[in-house]
Amino acid sequence: MRCLLKVTIPVETGNATIADGSLPKTIESILAECKPEAAYFAEENGKRTGFIFLDMKEPSQIPALAEPWFLAFDAQVEFHPAMNVDDLKKSAPGMEKAVKQFRRPERPKAA
């Protein structure tokens, strides 16, 4: 299953690993292990954040994917199922069924 692995590095840890030169080498090493489809890095809420897209074959991979970030950076790690455009197209029948089954009637708007 395609997943977004979101990694948030605390400012203090990020600063320390930049100062000692280990941040880029460690990230490169972790990414070499997890073999992502894509990896992007940006600021989110004032912290260094990685958005890493990868194919997770089974949930038992979660510790192997998360632990390097915990151990190297004291990072916060989140996993989110993700879809590409083809996946989204395939999901259309399920969405249509949900709309028919669960959509609430429109409520009149107040004047």
Segment roles from a protein language model:
Residues M1-A111:
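Conserved, structured core segments of small domains
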